[in-house]
């Protein structure tokens, strides 16, 4: 093999390694059986959420994963493999892939990584059920506001009852 080809392959492995390092979450899927239209639709949904999906040779994935410290993923990187690298929203790759897999039986989630740790299929599915960051923040805010709101209603009710008694 020529040195030029080896250098290109090493560059691809390095690029995938950097994506593994920078991604908040990674979801690995088997896309066998999806039409070009369906894959294009999936890529569009992922892109809108700030997630990059790539089809990468399994040997490159294995080498990059080993370099990143994700050992034991050899079973995950077999057959046709696409990888979704998450950005700021840690739940986006899992959520979008799981929803797409519900609608398209051909898409199979194999596993992935969450914040630098290897995740099982169950963990990926649990992550997919969580709302995005904005949804979680709004839930937290409503929980924090509830006691204050209830106290305000109680004070208003007491004030209203005193006004009625005075009248």
From Swiss-Prot:
It comes from the Bacteria. PROSITE patterns: RIBOSOMAL_L10. Forms part of the ribosomal stalk, playing a central role in the interaction of the ribosome with GTP-bound translation factors. It comes from Ligilactobacillus salivarius (strain UCC118) (Lactobacillus salivarius). It holds the Pfam family Ribosomal_L10. GO terms for biological process: translation. Keywords: Ribonucleoprotein, Ribosomal protein, RNA-binding, rRNA-binding. HAMAP family: Ribosomal_uL10. One of its GO terms (molecular function) is large ribosomal subunit rRNA binding. The lineage of its organism: Bacteria, Bacillati, Bacillota, Bacilli, Lactobacillales. This is Large ribosomal subunit protein uL10.
């Amino acid at each position: 093999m020529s040195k030029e080809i080896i250098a290109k392959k090493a560059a691809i492995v390095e690029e995938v390694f950097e994506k593994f390092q920078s991604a908040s979450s990674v979801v690995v899927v088997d896309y066998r059986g999806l039409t070009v239209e369906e894959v294009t639709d999936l890529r569009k949904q992922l892109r809108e959420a700030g997630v990059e999906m790539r089809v990468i040779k399994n040997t490159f994935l294995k080498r990059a994963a080993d370099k990143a410290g994700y050992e034991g993923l050899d079973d995950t990187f077999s057959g046709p493999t696409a990888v979704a690298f998450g950005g700021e929203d840690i739940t986006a790759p899992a959520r979008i892939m799981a929803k797409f897999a519900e609608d398209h039986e051909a898409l199979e989630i194999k596993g992935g990584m969450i914040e630098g740790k290897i995740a099982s299929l169950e963990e990926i599915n649990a992550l997919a059920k969580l709302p995005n960051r904005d949804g979680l923040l709004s839930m937290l805010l409503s929980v924090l506001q509830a006691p204050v709101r209830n106290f305000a209603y109680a004070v208003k009710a007491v004030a209203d009852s005193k006004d009625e008694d005075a009248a």
